[in-house]
Amino acid sequence: MLESEGRLMTRRMAIVVLAATMGVPAFAALKTHDTAPDFSAKASLAGEEFQFSLKSALQKGPVVVYFYPSAFTAGCNIEAHTFSENKEKFDAAGASIIGVSRDSITRLNAFSADPQYCAGKIAVASDPEGTIATSYGLTKMAVRAGMKDSRGVEIDHDFTERTTFVVTPDGKIADVFSTADDKVSPADHVVKSLAAVQALAGHKPSQP
């Protein structure tokens, strides 16, 4: 009898725990003051492939790590263009920028060189399996079947939610903002990240 009651109690406790956790996302994006996971990935700058290392980039100053859904799509085009237009201001604050998406390196070679978007100024890294995004607690969004990019080319990869992390040289996250949680527009990801790196450098924030 006591054994049966014990099993019943165990089942009830399991149900309570399950009910308490239902609806909680499998991942939660990293927050301010968390340690930014190090990563290395194939990347492209001005159409040229190279191996990007966050650890190496941080030795030179803060790094803006911005995740975006896909190259050659409306919001991502705006974001890349705005970053490229303000690259000199990030340079003045001693900060570098790396975009990360699930695009193939072939797509990113074209995107990084396109004068309308990255304009040869912004490096973008390929995260085809979403490994980097997952380490930052970001969720995958399935691409709609037959969806095409702004060039009319079918998109063959899933998306990562648009989220930006500002990482300090000691590997800590100084700021983070997302379109999903904070309703930040693609262009405002640039505005906010620029203000964050200028604050780290002790500069007066400027308007992109």
Locate each region found by the language model.
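Chalcogenol-based redox active-site neighborhoods
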Residues: 27-208
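N-terminal export leaders
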Residues: 9-15
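N-terminal secretory signal peptides that target proteins for export/translocation
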Residues: 1-9
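N-terminal signal peptide c-region/cleavage motif recognized by signal peptidases
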Residues: 23-25
